[in-house]
């Protein structure tokens, strides 16, 4: 254990030095989402350059339930960071109007993210963009499995210089580093959440109404998994964009279908569908169909990775 502590201490020292040397007397912004990757990168960068780091939290409209409040409270109030909150929901929805291809979605989201970051950077005079990119992000992007909004989704021409202090780490290593940096468990044990957010948990075109449905379903899945004391790698809901026939009283119903995905993994590179107790799945299905009037059917995805990826898009 002591050996690993020393390894992380050395890693932290090296990364702090690298960030300081790279940024110099300039300012930097960091793309902060509240997930473990960007949070760890933010704390590392904050130690390196202090108030010259400006954390930018963009509300895309594709966030989990309660996410904006959680991020603002944690990083502005508890960590004392310079936090810039940007409400860009209308901008992202407009950019994705009519788009159904998942790769196109990711690239558009990456482009709009960068546009927002460049605007904030210009306002504060920052030259650098720090990102929480980790190894699986660029491995999947290079392998053309899927573009990650912070790698394959980035435009070719950037006005900001990119710094990626975590790019050689895997998720389990980032969690260890976060713990070593003193981040609370509510951060370092958070389930991974895709950079494009709920936009890639809606199959087909993204609309505010569809996002509202999948956000509520996702919250129910997370709540029930936590109540059951289960610790999966990821647990979430996907709106399939397929309506099926059901019965409501004595009347025919034609409603949306939600898929539930719960997997176990160590680093996200491979994953197994979790053998969730039947009563937990039943509770999830009951709550989703009872609390979200638009949903009439809930399915459980039992596919491993490979052949499937963890996220549907």
Curated annotation (Swiss-Prot):
GMPS ATP-PPase domain segment(s): 6-190
Domain of life, per lineage: Archaea
Alphabetical keyword list: ATP-binding, GMP biosynthesis, Ligase, Nucleotide-binding, Purine biosynthesis
One GO cellular component term noted in the UniProt record for this chain: cytosol
GO terms of molecular function: ATP binding; GMP synthase activity
CDD domains attached to this UniProt entry: GMP_synthase_C
Pfam family, one: GMP_synt_C
Pathway listed: Purine metabolism; GMP biosynthesis; GMP from XMP (L-Gln route): step 1/1
Enzymatic class: ligase
Matches recorded under PROSITE patterns: GMPS_ATP_PPASE
Its EC number(s): 6.3.5.2
Presence of keyword Electron transport: no
Gene3D superfamilies assigned: 3.30.300.10, HUPs
Residues forming coiled coils: none
Reaction(s) catalysed (UniProt annotation): XMP + L-glutamine + ATP + H2O = GMP + L-glutamate + AMP + diphosphate + 2 H(+)
Binding residue positions for ATP: 33-39
Subunit organization: Heterodimer composed of a glutamine amidotransferase subunit (A) and a GMP-binding subunit (B).
Record's function text: Catalyzes the synthesis of GMP from XMP.
Protein name: GMP synthase [glutamine-hydrolyzing] subunit B
Organism: Pyrococcus furiosus (strain ATCC 43587 / DSM 3638 / JCM 8422 / Vc1)
Lineage: Archaea, Methanobacteriati, Methanobacteriota, Thermococci, Thermococcales
